[in-house]
């Protein structure tokens, strides 16, 4: 059965896929086109009302990259709701800070590998 995604969510998801930040771009170079453990990852994937940075649906894994704004209380509370929703759908959510991508991309990739 085809999923019906409301147009505002679909439009936002499309915009996010076209305009990504440098940290998403860097991680995407490792995940795209089956380069990482021969798995299929997608960017800016909509699940319910939320959009996640990366998903590997075959492994029920979601990856979120967080900048410093995610330490603000209202954004942090939103992230908790988002993660709880994904968990209830059967997904495992991994979160990394942007500086982890800059300073320790190999460590990030190892953590992802351990969780697939």
Give the predicted meaning of each segment.
Residues 1-39, 88:
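Solvent-exposed, charged helical/coil patches
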Residues 16, 45-115:
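Basic, amphipathic alpha-helical patches used to engage nucleic acids or provide basic targeting signals
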């Amino acid at each position: 059965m085809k999923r019906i995604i409301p147009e505002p969510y679909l439009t936002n998801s499309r915009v996010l896929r076209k305009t990504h930040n440098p940290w998403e771009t860097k991680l995407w170079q490792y995940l795209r086109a089956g380069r990482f453990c021969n798995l299929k990852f997608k960017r800016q994937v909509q699940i319910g009302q939320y959009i996640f940075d990366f998903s590997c649906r075959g492994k029920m894994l979601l990856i979120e990259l967080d900048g410093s704004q995610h330490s603000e209380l209202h954004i942090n509370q939103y992230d908790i709701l988002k993660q709880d929703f994904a968990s209830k759908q059967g997904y495992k959510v991994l979160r990394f800070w942007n500086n982890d991508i800059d300073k320790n991309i190999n460590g990030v990739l190892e953590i992802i590998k351990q969780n697939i």
